[in-house]
Amino acid sequence: MIISISLNAALSSERTFSMSVGDEVKFNENTIEFAKISLQKSSNFESLSADFIFSNGDDTFELYPEKRKYFVRGEITTESDISIKPIKDIYITIGEQQSNGKWIVNLQENYFVRLIWISAIIMSLGAVLVIRRRIYV
């Protein structure tokens, strides 16, 4: 677990950008395009849903982060979207709109997240085995 957490801390990165619809930025090996933003309504909230297109050579995918406003409490939440890959996860969130019309966009690349979870599961199974063994001794 220590190795996976150390690798995650050493390799992960985070950047914040100010973007308008149509803007493109480079983040590590990815090119990210802010394709569009749209208003969507649900039964108990309305959301601003953004569409970001990630491209890296042959690999192209889209992520859709949201800002939601719930009708009952008037509460505003930020819903991130995550691209899950075997070695790394890419998180994207959309923040507030600035006075110049641009949006704050936060990008994170986290490595070896699944390895951290697998390590925790192995440790838990080890603890269960130790407890079971003591009961039957």
Predicted regions and their residues:
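Solvent-exposed, non-transmembrane regions of integral membrane proteins
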Residues: M1-V137
